[in-house]
A protein has these predicted regions:
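Tryptophan-anchored aromatic micro-motifs
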Residues: 12-22
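Generic low-complexity segments that are intrinsically disordered, proline-rich and/or Lys/Arg-biased
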Residues: 1-3, 21, 25, 38, ...
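Basic/aromatic-rich interaction segments and small domains that mediate binding to polyanionic partners
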Residues: 26-62
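Hydrophobic alpha-helical membrane-spanning segments
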Residues: 7-9, 31-35, 42-45, 73, ...
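Mixed-charge, Lys/Arg-rich low-complexity intrinsically disordered regions
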Residues: 1-12
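Intrinsically disordered, low-complexity, charged/polar segments
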Residues: 51-108
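Intrinsically disordered, low-complexity segments enriched in small/polar residues
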Residues: 5, 21, 26, 41-43, ...
């Protein structure tokens, strides 16, 4: 994972953001960028950790979409972090990964 503010390129579905959380979330929160193909708001974030896992946090506005690629514009995300994504976390504390790693083996 690397800091979002240093990440190069835009974000595609499956990208994971990790940052310090606050109530009602846990100490750290992961969000996954998801695509809603049958919606006028094509991209959004789903909480992927803790008690809120599986819940849609936000559907992003059309202006968040990247031009020329399927995903969202990294600079739009940085500029609009506190207004659209998470008010109490600093964008400088947000880390990004292209996706979760595939486990080497599964333990059930």
């Amino acid at each position: 994972m690397q800091k979002l503010v240093h990440y190069r390129g835009n974000l595609a579905h499956g990208a994971v953001l990790r940052f310090p959380g606050s109530y009602p979330h846990e100490k750290y929160v992961d969000l996954m960028l998801v695509e809603f193909p049958d919606s006028d708001r094509k991209f959004g974030f789903v909480v992927s950790t803790g008690h809120k896992a599986g819940l849609i946090l936000v559907k992003l506005p059309k202006e968040a979409e990247a031009v020329g690629s399927a995903g969202i514009d990294r600079q739009w995300l940085i500029d609009n972090w506190n207004a659209w994504i998470y008010e109490s976390a600093k964008v400088g504390d947000v880390y990004v990964a292209q996706h979760y790693p595939v486990p080497v083996r599964a333990e059930l």
